[in-house]
Regions:
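N-terminal subdomain of nucleotide-sugar transferases
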Residues: 1-45, 49, 59, 88, ...
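Short N-terminal targeting/anchoring amphipathic segment
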Residues: 66-71, 80-104, 119-120
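Nucleotide-sugar donor phosphate/pyrophosphate-binding loop at the beta->alpha transition
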Residues: 117-122, 128-147, 156, 160, ...
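Short donor-sugar binding/catalytic loops of nucleotide-sugar-dependent glycosyltransferases
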Residues: 10-12, 207-211, 226, 240-242
Length: 254
């Protein structure tokens, strides 16, 4: 049995990373390992968070130990958390990396944790080069990557981005697993009835947070082309705006 600690967002934080991390912790536990999660007491300051809320309204997952400790903007917290993590004597730390802004906090925590000369650190890199560039991206990313022993990516693009920064450490590309924790699978017919959608209509689904880099504006432009309009295809947008809605609404009105 190994002792595994997963570092990244977890309940009460919401989003895909939290869902993934919690399911991964359960998978380790199901295999007989001791698993827990180390999450954030402060992930993003409110003034830089573009959505409505960082927190989930869902109940906490059962049978998962979640330590809510990391303050992403407090260096004193990084040292305390790193010292705590070092004392846990984990066999394996799995850390998520998705944004250079997290590099200083996570890199410092991991450097202190690995001083126990026991713990191995594997990074699951969701992004290495961010979708939206900011000052400090490259040094923050380098600082973080140097604290890891090996890497997992879930796309060829992220793997190639990783190799721009880290050319020699072991890295493996795997497919993003399918989630199995959202209830029973519905057939297309059942799902359409539940959502009130016509059974035989052709539908394109845009699903998820709405941010500029995701290209919803380009999809709207494409849907307005006569060659598309004449097909009778319908666009269904299901997501939360992470930026001003006005521009998108103007496109719809046109």
């Amino acid at each position: 049995m190994a002792r595994v600690i997963i570092i990244g967002p977890a309940h009460p934080l919401r989003g895909g990373l939290a869902t993934f991390n919690q399911r991964l912790a359960k998978a380790f536990a199901d295999e007989g390992h001791e698993s827990s999660l180390l999450s954030f007491s402060l992930q993003y300051p409110d003034f830089i968070f573009p959505g409505t809320t960082q927190y989930s309204s869902e109940p906490a997952p059962e049978n998962l130990l979640i330590h809510t400790k990391i303050n992403s903007i407090n260096p004193f917290n990084w040292i305390r958390t790193g010292n705590w993590l070092r004392k846990q004597q984990a066999d394996l730390i799995i850390v998520r990396f998705w944004l250079p802004l997290m590099g200083p906090a996570l890199g410092t925590i991991l450097r202190r944790a690995r001083k126990n000369k026991k713990t191995k650190i594997i990074c699951i890199a969701d992004n290495v080069i961010p979708h939206e560039k900011r000052p400090g991206d490259k040094p923050f990313t380098r600082y973080f990557l140097k604290s890891c022993d090996a890497f997992i990516t879930m796309s060829e693009k992220v793997m190639s981005d990783l190799r721009l920064f880290e050319k020699t450490k072991p890295a493996l590309q795997v497919a993003h697993p399918l989630y199995d924790n959202f209830g029973a699978i519905l057939s297309k017919t059942e799902a359409r009835i539940h959502l009130g959608l016509p059974a035989d209509e052709k539908i394109i689904l845009f699903f998820g947070f709405i941010r500029k880099y995701k290209g919803l504006d380009l999809l709207f432009d494409a849907m307005s082309l006569p060659a598309i309009k004449n097909t009778g295809i319908r666009l269904l947008v299901a997501g939360e705006f992470y930026e001003e809605e006005k521009g998108y609404q103007a496109q719809i009105d046109q």
